[in-house]
UniProtKB/Swiss-Prot annotation:
This enzyme's EC code(s): 2.7.4.8
Signal peptide: none
Function noted in UniProt: Essential for recycling GMP and indirectly, cGMP.
Catalytic class of the enzyme: transferase
The species this protein was found in: Leifsonia xyli subsp. xyli (strain CTCB07)
Domain Guanylate kinase-like: 64-243
Swiss-Prot/TrEMBL keywords: ATP-binding, Cytoplasm, Kinase, Nucleotide-binding, Transferase
Keyword Lipoprotein included in the entry's annotation: no
Binding site for ATP: 71-78
Gene Ontology CC, one term: cytosol
GO molecular function annotations of the record: ATP binding; guanylate kinase activity
Record protein name field: Guanylate kinase
Amino acid sequence: MEGRIRVTEFLLSVPAIGTTKTQDALRRLGIAPSKRLGGLGRHQRLRLRVFLIEREERPVRRRKHLVVLAGPTAVGKGTVSAYIRENYPEVLLSVSATTRSPRPGEVDGVNYYFVDDAAFDRMIAAGDLLEHATVHNAYRYGTPRAPIEKALDDGRSVLLEIDLQGARQVRASMPEARLIFLLPPTWEELVRRLTGRGTEDAAEQQRRLETAKVELAAQNEFDHRVVNHTVADAAREVVDLMMVRPAPVRPSTA
């Protein structure tokens, strides 16, 4: 049965390799992407075995953490992430792509990559996004894959600020990722923050609050929860959690 598995699928199942590294490995090993394990020649099998042994012996400390920060609308994810970017240079904050228009003060390539729907479709088709989702039934957001894989291989910790849908996709594709849920002190404070920022009309505010209820109900899916009383304290707690040694993978109860 194992011999029928394509080498591409086999490599993608190895932790921390990913699509980009798999493609590079196949080129170096001289193995076609469509080749199956059972169809490898003797020299190809040997090269693949050596490649896997070398990866296994590589110092574990080089591979840092991928951490996802998610939470309901207006909880302050962007503000906390910006604080981490400015005050914790050892952490790489991933820049997402989005189809929405820039808000006042946002800079393309720093806060987001602002793209149109056609460009976003091309990124999906090319497999360039680690995750993507439509948020608030309006705009699409996605995380470019290549910068994250390169940063992790270079030994940097990476923080992704994404929504609940994206967090679930990352958990499915990268189980070793650490998921942190950012909470408001109270529901009333969340409503105050949303209505006070003045970037949405009343109908949009109501839609976002309904989405927030769904997101808050899913907080137990996350590894850690942080309450955003103040930006500095929440940011410090998120960074501290990024540096904690990961717990063993929990066995499935299925």
